[in-house]
């Protein structure tokens, strides 16, 4: 884990960042009021749903990420016309594959959909009779091998296509588990390092036995290189979310890999009626929106993003630095984590008179609502979904909550 322990001359930092007057004199109500006046989300509030500042991450439960303006424009433009959907899917898949340097690609309605379609492709190999029959996979190759420590709720998406999960814990067990019923090896990228079986074991075993290997890389952007590098390692299919790091439509995903497997996935997908993917509809708006998102992401200045995100975390750390017993750490996770700056904030709960859970709840209950991660050993903040200026609101609100508790303690 690459860590930067925060060491601050608080006044000097706040002056340089333009925050000294904000922390020293402005009342929180004025700051929050100005924020809400500029970004209030009235259409949501009319429904009783409060928009939030997202310092937690690209979770689907918090609606992933906010689309780039160019993506919204592309979707609006797409909405004005009728097109043959199959032709559009094939054309956009071909364009994306060429852009990122992979054999083939297709737009799905999300990373979980990519899991289902990848599994269906590997089980059916595009055979029309099998396509119509699944999830009834009686008599077919239907076993999907996973590392036991990689099991998760999302493997339901493989089972939905009729896949039977076979668990292994060692390279030896992986080798023994592969047989004439094995349809796919299923690796979860974020769980690399869990257990004794790594990605190289999976890739090598798949090659030896001619079994397709799928990598669920839903949230593995950034880094941008993941778009081609994971397939380049030897995986036959890789699935990404379109509505997380790429800032594409929330109801979109990307499945990339071998040409014949992507073709088989298409046969299992919308708009074909008698398929497992018919209910996973991705419309022309999402397809064109994701194409634009990939174009933007491919050309983006990712180094600038990293500098900006680290600045967000450092500013929040500076703003809570005078809380008794506070300990802040800006860090980038190691293997298995997302390579972007996070902030961990810890304090002595007895000295401050406030538990992490209580602070977490007050952040959510306040106005504006702020979401962070409560890790029980401290609060963790993610930089990716913050807009410039929001870090000041987060820092002021955390400081307000913590100092108020410390005064009462």
Where are these regions (language model features)?
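Conserved N-terminal alpha-helix of the aminotransferase class I/II PLP-enzyme fold
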Residues: 68-111, 121
């Amino acid at each position: 884990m690459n860590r930067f322990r925060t060491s601050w001359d608080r006044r000097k930092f706040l002056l340089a960042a333009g925050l000294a007057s904000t922390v020293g004199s402005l009342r929180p109500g004025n700051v929050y009021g100005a924020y809400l006046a500029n970004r209030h989300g009235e259409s949501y509030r009319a429904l009783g749903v409060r928009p939030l500042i997202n310092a937690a991450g690209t979770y689907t439960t918090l609606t992933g990420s906010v689309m780039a303006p160019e993506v919204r424009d592309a979707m609006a433009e797409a909405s004005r016309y009728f097109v043959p959907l199959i032709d559009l899917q094939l054309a956009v898949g071909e364009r994306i594959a060429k852009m990122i340097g992979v054999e083939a690609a297709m737009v799905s309605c999300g990373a979980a959909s990519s899991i289902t379609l990848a599994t269906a492709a590997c089980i059916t190999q595009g055979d029309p009779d099998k396509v119509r029959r699944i999830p009834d996979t009686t008599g077919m190759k239907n076993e999907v091998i996973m590392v036991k420590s990689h099991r998760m709720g999302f493997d339901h998406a493989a089972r939905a296509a009729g896949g039977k999960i076979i668990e292994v814990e060692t390279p030896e067990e992986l080798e023994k588990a592969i047989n004439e019923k094995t349809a796919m090896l299923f690796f979860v990228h974020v769980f690399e390092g869990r257990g004794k079986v790594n990605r190289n074991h999976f890739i090598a075993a798949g090659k030896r036995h001619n079994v397709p290997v799928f990598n669920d890389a839903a949230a593995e952007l950034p880094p941008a290189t993941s778009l081609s590098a994971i397939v380049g390692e030897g995986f036959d299919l890789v699935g990404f979310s379109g509505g997380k790091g790429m800032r594409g439509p929330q109801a979109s995903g990307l499945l990339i890999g071998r040409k014949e497997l992507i073709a088989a996935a298409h046969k299992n997908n919308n708009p074909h009626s008698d398929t497992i993917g018919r209910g996973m509809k991705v419309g022309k708006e999402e397809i064109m929106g994701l194409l634009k998102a990939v174009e933007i992401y491919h050309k983006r200045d990712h180094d600038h993003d990293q500098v900006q995100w680290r600045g967000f975390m450092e500013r929040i750390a500076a703003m809570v630095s005078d809380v008794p017993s506070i300990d802040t750490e800006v860090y980038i996770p190691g293997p298995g984590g997302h390579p972007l700056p996070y902030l961990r904030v810890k304090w002595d709960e007895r000295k401050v008179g406030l538990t992490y859970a209580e602070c977490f709840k007050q952040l959510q209950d306040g106005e504006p609502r702020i979401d962070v991660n409560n890790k029980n050993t401290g609060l963790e903040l993610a930089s990716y979904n913050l807009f410039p200026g929001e870090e000041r609101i987060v820092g002021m609100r955390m400081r307000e909550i913590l100092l108020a508790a410390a005064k009462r303690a």
